[in-house]
């Protein structure tokens, strides 16, 4: 399903921050990338998601998802893939929500970015997803701010 072959990631003309990284992941597997702060965990995942910041680039190697190289993806390809087929869960995921916007509006925006649907339908889908996670009172969560 996901195969990373001899990955090297570089920022600008500096020496690569990641070198010779390999990973093979089969369907149904859950993998955690663990390491010290600054060891390149986030850089590897950002490379897999095509989301390296600034001058970051894959200098060598390949990243295959279902046998297709992700390095050839267009921005449109990435939009279709991210969040629906492949995603990242941050260690401190609470920091990814805007603290001055309600959770529901952010969740709906995210769903609509990845799936063409009306906001009302996206809201219902979000409530359903929260309920499936057995979170109490999904509607209340959607109407709350991240800090509540």
Stretch-by-stretch model annotation:
Residues 4-7, 16-31, 61:
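Conserved beta-strand
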Residues 11-12, 52, 65, 72:
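Conserved A-loop
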Residues 31, 42-55:
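Short, conserved post-Walker A segment of ABC-type ATPase nucleotide-binding domains
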Residues 34-36:
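The feature captures the beta-strand-to-loop junction immediately N-terminal to the Walker
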Residues 57-69:
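Conserved ABC transporter NBD signature motif
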Residues 70-87, 105, 113:
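ABC ATPase NBD coupling module
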Residues 92, 99-113, 125:
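Q-loop/switch helix immediately C-terminal to the Walker
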Residues 121-140:
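Conserved ABC ATPase "signature" region
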């Amino acid at each position: 399903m996901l195969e990373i072959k001899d990955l090297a990631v570089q920022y600008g003309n500096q020496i690569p921050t990641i070198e010779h990284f390999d990973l093979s992941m089969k369907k149904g597997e859950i993998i955690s990338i663990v390491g010290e702060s600054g060891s390149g965990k986030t850089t590897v995942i950002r490379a897999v998601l095509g989301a390296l910041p600034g001058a970051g680039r894959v200098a060598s190697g390949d990243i295959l998802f279902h046998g297709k190289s992700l390095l050839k993806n267009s921005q449109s390809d990435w939009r279709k893939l991210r969040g629906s087929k492949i995603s990242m869960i941050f260690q401190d995921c609470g920091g990814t929500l805007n603290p001055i916007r309600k959770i529901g509006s952010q969740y709906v925006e995210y769903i609509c970015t990845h799936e063409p649907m009306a906001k009302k339908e996206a809201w219902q889908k979000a409530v359903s997803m929260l309920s499936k996670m057995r979170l109490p009172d999904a509607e209340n969560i959607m109407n709350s701010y991240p800090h509540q």
